Amino acid sequence: MAEEKWGIAHIFASFNNTIITVTDLSGAETVTKSSGGMVVKQDRNESSPYAAMQMAIQVAQNARDKGITGVHVKVRAPGRGKQRSPGPGAQAAIRALARAGMRIGRIEDVTPVPHDSIRGKGGRRGRRV
């Protein structure tokens, strides 16, 4: 059996878009990447699970062509002052990567979470409707 080569799949999943980037283990060299707008026509479908599946298949194929057989997954949501839960594409992307033949190592959530709070959008008096 051939030597396994691992990479890191960075999945950024918001409610507006999903972006998948595969890098080497150091994270410095990008192997392949894809976003929702590259696989679907309508803007509203960029964050959908279907778009995430198509992206993951495309990314897995490109990564395998470059010799990467397994990935550690880092899932990220917008975080900070925005939502801390990943969008609908995150789970679908991980499942599709596994089905496309990539070995999945560790799955980690790397959403930036503030330890205090930051000034909310809209300022001190809030959004005036």
From Swiss-Prot:
Residues 107-129 are annotated as: Disordered. One of its GO terms (molecular function) is structural constituent of ribosome. Pfam families: Ribosomal_S11. GO terms for cellular component: ribonucleoprotein complex; ribosome. It comes from the Archaea. GO terms for biological process: translation. InterPro entries: Ribosomal_uS11, Ribosomal_uS11_archaeal, Ribosomal_uS11_CS, Ribosomal_uS11_sf. Keywords: Ribonucleoprotein, Ribosomal protein, RNA-binding, rRNA-binding. Part of the 30S ribosomal subunit. NCBIfam families: arch_S11P, PRK09607.1. Located on the platform of the 30S subunit. Belongs to the universal ribosomal protein uS11 family. This is Small ribosomal subunit protein uS11. It comes from Methanoculleus marisnigri (strain ATCC 35101 / DSM 1498 / JR1). The gene is rps11.
